[in-house]
UniProtKB/Swiss-Prot annotation:
This is Microtubule-associated protein 9. The keyword Acetylation applies. The modification N-acetylserine is found at S2. It comes from the Eukaryota. Residues 184-210, 298-328, 443-628 form a coiled coil. Disulfide bonds: none annotated. The gene is MAP9. It is found in: Cytoplasm; Cytoplasm, Cytoskeleton; Cytoplasm, Cytoskeleton, Spindle. Binds to purified microtubules via its C-terminus. The modification Phosphotyrosine is found at Y12. One of its GO terms (cellular component) is spindle midzone.
Length: 647
């Protein structure tokens, strides 16, 4: 039976209509069931297998289905009844074909799937088919009894173990869907995964940044201060204040160290007061100079970037010199200085806070004030150092010996005691000093007079040079005036000559124009006469040509008339000749007719004679039949008739 069902050639011998219909219907049912089983197996394999198998199955579905259908449908031969009545499909002889269909269908499906799937996916496809074989057979048996309809996706009923496994994996296993939906879902899942990763990263960053952003009271104060300063300050001013505050702290810490409390020297109270007053002034000026210097350096760093480390070193050196000078001050003074330093530091910090609101215009004023402060501090430093470094009388050194006495002027006590050698020496020395001073003053006066004389001489020389220069300038001016007059006279002469030449040229142009006008008139008259003569000549020529043309026309007309006459005569002759020829032809025709009549008559006569002779011959043959046996002559001419001898 299986051979009969799956035979490629249809059984036309038994019952043609029934066999055609049953074989066609059975094969059609087989193709439909195989397709449905293949689609179900591919869907479940897509659900349980990886995405790679899905992508491989996409390429092989349509081609494999078409190949399987084409293989089975190649040898079908549809009858005329089926073409006329396609709706009357009767499922006859189904009992014979059902068992064979169920037996052979899994093999065909497995073969088609092996053709579709790649080598690496064969085991997975075979497993999926083996799981779905039993259910496919039951479904096919039910479907063969019914009419074929469009496929509806049915939910697969699994075993208890499979149900348990599915219950555990319900949260991640999707329901079976078409391939296009699976592809779209995979793309959407990738996008959702990327979005989940981004949200997780953002949450982690927020968690990490949360503890760092917890507010503290110190932080709140700092932020409030920063906001207040940032509202009042430009970015350049903020740089200035930071640099100024740091530099002030360093330099003030270096300059006002506790080592400044040195040993006090033995001085008078007035000198100590003056020294304290000067030192306090110098310290205040120094602080102002430091603050102004560092403000200017900060501005220059932020704007021009031209302040170097040498300025800082010089300022440190100045501070060290000041500290060396201040080591001789009393401890009370050092305490007062420390108090003043603290107050000045607070004042300077307040000043820096106020200066933060000031912009670039006040930085120039700060530079000027810093320069003046530096000059003032240098003067105060010089004064204080000169006063402090003056040695007292009590502590003066005695290494000069008795030469110091010479510098002292003789007092009343010394004048009372003139015998002492030191006093004599001092008096002599003082007289010599007075004479020397007088001499020096005289020499200085002489030098001053000489310098004045030299100055006067130089002034006189300069005046003489100026007078000479003025005289030379006047002479040069007079020479230039003469030359200018000469040049002006030359220019006037040149202008006169130019005017004369222009007038002469104008007169020549006028004469030339008059001559040209005359020549033009003559030329026009000549051309008019020439044109008139040419016109007359052309007229005469035209008349001659017209006459010649008229003569030629006359000659032509006469020639044409003669030719026409000749032509008419020639045509008349031709007509006459044609008439003569016609007559001759008619005569010939008449002669021919006569000859034909004569020939016909002669022919008729000849025929009559011939008939007569034939009759005579026939009669003679009948009469003399016995003479036929006699030998004929060896040759007889065809035109001549040989008569037999009559006995």
């Amino acid at each position: 039976m299986s051979d009969e069902v799956f035979s490629t050639t249809l059984a036309y011998t038994k019952s043609p209509k029934v066999t055609k219909r049953t074989t066609f219907q059975d094969e059609l049912i087989r193709a439909i069931t195989a397709r449905s089983a293949r689609q179900r197996s591919s869907e479940y394999s897509d659900d349980f297998d990886s995405d790679e198998i899905v992508s491989l199955g996409d390429f092989s579905d349509t081609s494999a289905d078409e190949n399987s259908v084409n293989k089975k449908m190649n040898d079908f031969h549809i009858s005329d009844d089926e073409e006329k009545n396609p709706s009357k499909l009767l499922f006859l002889k189904t009992n014979k074909s059902n068992g064979n269909i169920t037996k052979d269908e899994p093999v065909c499906a497995i073969k088609n799937e092996e053709e579709m799937a790649p080598d690496g996916c064969e085991d997975i496809v075979v497993k999926s088919f083996s799981e779905s074989q039993n259910k496919d057979e039951e479904f096919e048996k039910d479907k063969i009894k019914m009419k074929p309809k469009p496929r509806i996706l049915s939910i697969k009923s699994t075993s208890s173990a499979e149900n348990n496994s599915l219950d555990t994996d319900d949260h991640f296993k999707p329901s079976p869907r078409p391939r296009s939906m699976l592809k779209k879902k995979s793309h959407m899942e990738e996008k959702d995964g990327l979005e989940d990763k981004e949200t997780a990263l953002s949450e982690e960053l927020e968690l990490h940044s949360a503890p760092s952003s917890l507010p503290t009271p110190n932080g709140i104060q700092l932020e409030a201060e920063k906001k207040a300063f940032s509202e009042n300050l430009d970015p350049e001013d903020s740089c200035l204040t930071s640099l100024a505050s740091s530099s002030l702290k360093q330099i003030l810490g270096d300059s006002f160290s506790p080592g400044s409390e040195g040993n006090a020297s033995g001085k008078d109270p007035n000198e100590e007061i003056t020294e304290n007053h000067n030192s306090l002034k110098s310290d205040e000026n120094k602080e102002n100079s430091f603050s102004a210097d560092h403000v200017t350096t900060a501005v220059e760093k932020s704007k021009e970037s031209q302040v170097t480390a040498d300025d800082l070193e010089e300022e440190k050196a100045k501070a060290e010199l000041i500290m060396d000078d201040d080591r001789t001050v009393d401890p009370l003074l050092s305490k007062s200085q420390s108090i003043l330093i603290s107050t000045s530091a607070t004042a300077s910090s307040k000043k820096t806070i106020e200066d933060r609101n000031i912009k670039n215009k006040k930085s120039t004023n700060n530079r000027a004030s810093s320069a003046s402060a530096r000059l003032m501090t240098s003067e105060f430093l010089k004064k204080s150092s000169s006063k402090r470094r003056t040695p007292s009388t009590t502590t003066s050194s005695h290494y000069l010996g008795t030469l110091k006495v010479l510098d002292q002027k003789p007092s009343q006590k010394q004048s009372i005691e003139p015998d002492r050698a030191d006093n004599i020496r001092a008096a002599v020395y003082q007289e010599w000093l007075e004479k020397k001073n007088v001499y020096l003053h005289e020499m200085h006066r002489i030098k001053r007079i000489e310098s004045e004389n030299l100055r006067i001489q130089n002034e006189q020389k300069k005046a003489a040079k100026r007078e000479e220069a003025l005289a030379s300038f006047e002479a040069w001016k007079a020479m230039k005036e003469k030359e200018a007059k000469k040049i002006a006279a030359k220019k006037r002469l040149e202008e006169k000559n130019k005017k004369k030449t222009e007038e002469e040229n104008a007169a020549r142009k006028g004469e030339a124009l008059q001559a040209f006008e005359k020549w033009k008139e003559k030329k026009m008259e000549y051309l008019k006469e020439k044109n008139r003569k040419e016109r007359e000549y052309e007229r005469a020529k035209k008349q001659k040509e017209e006459e010649t043309v008229a003569e030629k026309k006359k000659d032509n007309l006469t020639a044409v008339e003669k030719w026409n006459e000749k032509k008419e005569a020639f045509f008349k002759q031709k007509e006459k000749e044609k008439i003569n020829e016609k007559r001759k032809e008619e005569l010939k025709r008449a002669e021919k007719k006569d000859k034909d009549k004569q020939a016909i008559n002669e022919y008729e006569k000849w025929l009559e004679n011939k008939e007569k002779q034939e009759r005579i011959e026939r009669k003679q043959k009948k009469r003399h039949s016995f003479l036929e046996s006699e030998a004929l002559p060896p040759w007889s001419p065809p035109s001549r008739t040989v008569f037999a001898k009559v006995f």
